[in-house]
């Protein structure tokens, strides 16, 4: 195999790897990740032979398998449904109610 053929094979492999990695970019939800809970996902990097971590874009819908739903913000899923777990707002309301009763 001559140098030209080797270069052609290498360029072709690079193109295929780039096309495959196109689905794995920050901010884009690959079709393979439609059922992924939370706001992060991993894609196999054939060059480094390791997993690369990516994040869904801000405003992207996110969910958890228990039914909670939210929106991604800076790589975290901020819930828009009541999860039944107290949050900072609940604590402030409770403090205000106690102050009013006193």
Swiss-Prot record:
Location in the cell reads: Secreted
The signal peptide, as residue positions, is 1-21
Task: Provide the glycosylation site positions.
Answer: 26, 87
Span list, region Disordered: 83-102
Conditions for induction: Up-regulated in salivary glands and midgut following blood feeding.
Per the record, the domain of life is Eukaryota
Q: In which tissues is it expressed?
A: Salivary gland (at protein level). Saliva (at protein level). Midgut.
InterPro entries reported in the protein's UniProt record: Ixonnexin-like (IPR011694)
- Gene Ontology cellular component annotations, sorted alphabetically: extracellular region
Q: What happens when the gene is disrupted?
A: RNAi-mediated knockdown results in impaired feeding of adult ticks, observed as decline in the engorgement weights. No significant effects on the ability of nymphs to feed.
Which keywords appear in this protein's UniProt record, sorted alphabetically? Glycoprotein, Secreted, Signal
Family assignment from sequence similarity: Belongs to the salp14 family.
Further comment: Does not show anticoagulant activity in in vitro assays.
User: What task does this protein carry out?
Assistant: Salivary protein that facilitates blood feeding of adult ticks on vertebrate species. Inhibits the lectin pathway of complement system activation in the host.
The protein here is known as Salivary protein Salp9
Organism the protein comes from: Ixodes scapularis (Black-legged tick)
Gene name of this polypeptide? Salp9Pac
